[in-house]
């Protein structure tokens, strides 16, 4: 059976950390920023980890399963 292909959109959006967690960026930080507060925009610019409920789905997209 051939190898699973990695989803091209996923490999651009997710990254693995050294401990094996999956890193992602926040949404809602690309346009229509005038009505959003400085605090909200600042918090959206930091990256975070994928929630544990979605890890298996993301790993499947990244062909890690």
From Swiss-Prot:
Keywords, in A-Z order: Ribonucleoprotein, Ribosomal protein
One cellular component (GO) term of this entry: cytosolic large ribosomal subunit
Residue ranges of the region described as Disordered: 1-40
GO biological process terms held by the UniProt record: translation
Hydrolase found in the keyword field: no
Keyword Ribosomal protein: yes
InterPro entries xref list: Ribosomal_bL35, Ribosomal_bL35-like, Ribosomal_bL35_CS, Ribosomal_bL35_sf
Family assignment from sequence similarity: Belongs to the bacterial ribosomal protein bL35 family.
Annotated HAMAP family: Ribosomal_bL35
Name the record gives this protein: Large ribosomal subunit protein bL35
Organism (species): Bacteroides fragilis (strain ATCC 25285 / DSM 2151 / CCUG 4856 / JCM 11019 / LMG 10263 / NCTC 9343 / Onslow / VPI 2553 / EN-2)
